[in-house]
Amino acid sequence: MPVEVSTIDRKWYRIIRKPKATSQEIVLFALRELKVDRYNPIVSVVLAHDALLLELNHKYRNINKPTNVLSFNYEALSHNCCLGEIFLSIDRLTYESKTLGVEVHAHFTHMLIHGVLHILGYDHEVPEDAQEMQALEIDLLSKRSIENPYLIQE
């Protein structure tokens, strides 16, 4: 089950120890826990910065500001599928961590799990879907000894 990781911004190496291996481990953990690892999907993770996420957010969502995570689903879940691509911004991640008073690694893990759920088809556009997605995030994060991020934001 390949998880391909590209590190576009070198700042990731100062913030996350072994960003490639850490990203792979978190994605594989989420896929295992969600019981979709048996499909052996390919997932791509791009560790980027605000400039790239601003460009992608504007191009694909018509939103002219950077964001913390963007996910693109490429294929429906099937054996050996190219499931999707997850982009993370180091700038948003570090800013939000400081603002929320959350450890960077915990926020990184949360955003990566959030991205995995998006490429699996979960969304948070309507309240019922948001509750389902948040419940999954909270459960997965708790299994990694990370507290509920939605309590912190209140």
Swiss-Prot record:
The keyword Lipid metabolism does not apply. Keywords: Cytoplasm, Endonuclease, Hydrolase, Metal-binding, Nuclease, Ribosome biogenesis, rRNA processing, Zinc. GO terms for cellular component: cytoplasm. Binds 1 zinc ion. It is found in: Cytoplasm. InterPro entries: MetalPrtase_cat_dom_sf_prd, YbeY, YbeY_CS. This is Endoribonuclease YbeY. It comes from Anaplasma phagocytophilum (strain HZ).
